[in-house]
A protein has these predicted regions:
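Extended, low-polarity transmembrane helix blocks
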Residues: 1-92, 99-315
Length: 315
């Protein structure tokens, strides 16, 4: 018979392991960072609507582009009011997720907000416009916030979250969590070649362009990385495709050490892409709305990190 002190202590809003709670706090921190970035002076001008939002409209079907054009008009005509609202909402989401009694409320509210921003602010990440590229942030950073909100949802006391093979399976189950991982990383394989990065000079030009306006030390790193890609566009695209495919299926492998090795590879790959191709999300340029997909994909990898279980995984 177990002593009461040995049992997991139910927390407000669901049973949350220390690991799961830490991951929730990281997600909250990224939301807070987004709110702070939204308060940059340039965001309160028409440049935000014209330079950040407007380019995402091009190429989308009219059913997607028309509402985006309408939303763009509102942001263009009321830059201060709309941006203040955006910044405050994101700060509120971060604080709500970080404060344990309102964690569920914050996660729940972040899902529709993320979907709205993904549509009206990111043009669905370029998925329908032909501009989706996993190196530059496809399928859109903000949709990953919604995914993480679902995967990090506090498990109710009746759920067998203690038996989950990784934190992502604690609420929705292992089968659903693995399927989401597979779909996301498999899409990277498709978009790697659909984006045209395998064309001669495409990847080199893309990486080189990211150095514009960046601090000298970061521009040096990016330019040297661009030199390494010169003439190797197809080869690098093939390697990336193979790595993305391996990461996609790795969650189905029966060997824990092998799964962890693939997740480490995913973390390293995310870090390289975040620095070299995404330039830390452009946070040094004064108009970044988020740190891009690099940190979010890294957090996602940690959410899928294998843990010791007390029993069979929940399907």
């Amino acid at each position: 018979m177990y002593e009461a002190s040995a049992l997991p202590r139910p927390l407000v809003g669901g049973v949350v392991s220390g690991r799961r709670r830490s991951l929730q706090l990281v997600l909250a921190g990224i939301w807070l960072l987004d709110g702070v970035l939204q308060f940059q002076p340039a965001m309160f001008t028409k440049n935000f609507a014209q330079m950040v939002v407007y380019p995402t409209i091009a190429g989308n079907p009219s059913v997607i582009a028309s509402p985006m054009t309408w939303a763009h008009g509102i942001m263009l005509n009321h830059p201060v009011g709309t941006n203040t609202a955006f910044a405050c909402i994101q700060l509120a989401l971060g604080l709500a997720i970080a404060y344990r009694p309102t964690t569920k409320l914050g996660l729940a509210a972040s899902i529709p907000w993320s979907i709205a921003v993904w549509w009206f602010g990111e043009g669905l990440g370029g998925v329908l416009s032909g501009g989706a590229d996993p190196l530059t942030g496809a399928p859109g950073a903000v949709i990953l916030y919604a995914l993480l909100a679902v995967l990090l949802w506090p498990a109710d006391e009746g759920d067998r979250s203690a038996a989950a093979p990784f934190e992502a399976a604690g609420f929705i189950g292992a089968h659903a969590a693995r399927a989401l991982w597979l779909v996301l990383w498999s899409s990277f394989v498709y978009f790697t070649f659909a984006s045209g990065n395998d064309a001669p000079g495409a990847l080199d030009d893309q990486v080189t362009s990211m150095a514009d306006g960046e601090p000298a030390w970061l521009a040096w790193i990016i330019n040297h990385a661009a030199n390494l890609t010169d003439g190797r566009d197809l080869a690098i695209s093939v390697v990336l495709g193979v790595l993305f495919a391996g990461i996609a299926v790795s969650v189905y492998l029966p060997w824990t050490r092998v799964r962890r090795a693939w997740l480490v590879l995913a973390l390293v790959l995310c870090a390289v892409i975040w620095v070299v191709v995404q330039a830390f999300g452009g946070v040094f340029l004064g108009m970044a709305t988020d740190p891009n997909t690099g940190p979010l994909l890294a957090l996602l990898a940690l959410v899928y990190w294998p843990v010791r279980t007390a029993g069979p995984a929940r399907p």
